[in-house]
Amino acid sequence: MDRTETRFRKRGQITGKITTSRQPHPQNEQSPQRSTSGYPLQEVVDDEMLGPSAPGVDPSPPCRSLGWKRKREWSDESEEEPEKELAPEPEETWVVEMLCGLKMKLKQQRVSSILPEHHKDFNSQLAPGVDPSPPHRSFCWKRKMEWWDESEESLEEEPRKVLAPEPEEIWVAEMLCGLKMKLKRRRVSLVLPEHHEAFNRLLEDPVIKRFLAWDKDLRVSDKYLLAMVIAYFSRAGFPSWQYQRIHFFLALYLANDMEEDDEDSKQNIFHFLYRKNRSRIPLLRKPWFQLGHSMNPRARKNRSRIPLLRKRRFQLYRSTNPRARKNRSRIPLLRKRRFQLYRSMNSRARKNRSQIVLFQKRRFHFFCSMSCRAWVSPEELEEIQAYDPEHWVWARDRAHLS
C-alpha cells in the first residue's frame, strides 16, 4: 500500500507542475486580440532598434543576407538618380481630306514627334573622327561597295532613259445644281506638243503616206486610231526624236488590237509591210501551175504506160518512137523545177514568218514601255484632236464614207 501511495503522490506533483506552466502570462492577457488557435499574434516591426544588445548577440535577423544588403544599396542609389523623361506619345490631329460643296471630310493624322534636337544628335554622331561603319563589315562587304561604286560610275556615263510619269488625277465639276455640286474624277492627259510634232514628222514619211493612201476604207487608220497613236507616244516615254516609222506601226497595231480586235485588219498591216515578199508567192504559184500543165496529154499518156513498158521492155524499146522517149525524159526535169520552186517559196515564207515574229516581239516591248496602259478614254482622244482641229488627219472619219 505504501508503494501505491507514493506513486499517486508523484503523479499529482507532476500534474501540478504542468498546470502551473500552462497558466497565462500577465503580459499576454493585456493583448486585446487572440488567434483562433489560442496562441497570441506576434507583431513584427522593420527598421526598429530595440536597444543595445549583448556583446555576443547579433542584432540582425538571420533571414537578411548579403544579397538583401546589395538590393537595399541599389534601391537607395536608384532613388537618388533623377527620373528619366519619357518620350511624349505622338499627338493626333484632324486634317481636311476633301471639300465637296458645304460638306467637309476630315481625316485623322498623327503628328510626328521628331524634333530638331534629334537631328542635331544624329549629326553629332557622324563627326569626322568617328567611324560610322559597324565592326561586322567583312571583306565581302568591301567587294560589294567597290562593285556598287563602279556600277554608279557606269550609270552616270550611260544616258538615262526618260520614264513616262504616271497621269495625275484631279476632280472636275461635272454638274452644279443649287448648292450641290457633283464631282468627277478625271485623269490629266500627259500628251505634250513634242508628241504632236513627232506624229506630224512621221506623217511626212513616204511609207506612211502610201499606207494611209492604201487604206481607203479606213479600216486600220481612222481618226480615233491615229489619235491613240499620239497617246501611246506620250505614255511610252521616249524622246520625240527617237520615234521612227516602226513605232508608228507598232502603236497603230496596238490601237487596232485594243479597239477593233479584228484579225483581218491587223493582217492588212502585215500585208502592207511585207508585201514585197508576200506578193511573190502568187507569182511562184503561177509558174508552178504552168509547169504542171506544160506536160501535154501525149506525155501524160506515155507516163501512164511506164508500167506496161517495164513489162515489155524489149518490145516497147523498139515500138516507142524518139518523140516518146523525149517526153519521158522531161518528167524528171519537171519534178526538179517544181521542187526548186517549192523550196524557194518556203524560204520566203519562213522569212516573212520571222519578220512577223520580230514585229510581235517589238510590239510587246513597246507595250511594256507604256506600263501596260493601252486603254485611252474618249475625253483624252477629244483633247488630242482639239490641239489642232484643222489637221487633215482628223478628217479620216468612217461616218463620212457612208
UniProtKB/Swiss-Prot annotation:
Please give one Gene Ontology molecular function term for this protein: protein kinase binding
List compositional bias (Polar residues) regions by residue number: 16-39
> Where are the annotated segments for Disordered?
1-89
Cite the record's Acidic residues compositional bias ranges.
76-89
Which family would the database say this protein is a member of?
A: Belongs to the Speedy/Ringo family.
Protein name per UniProt: Speedy protein E2B
Task: Please name the taxonomic classification of the source.
Answer: Eukaryota, Metazoa, Chordata, Craniata, Vertebrata
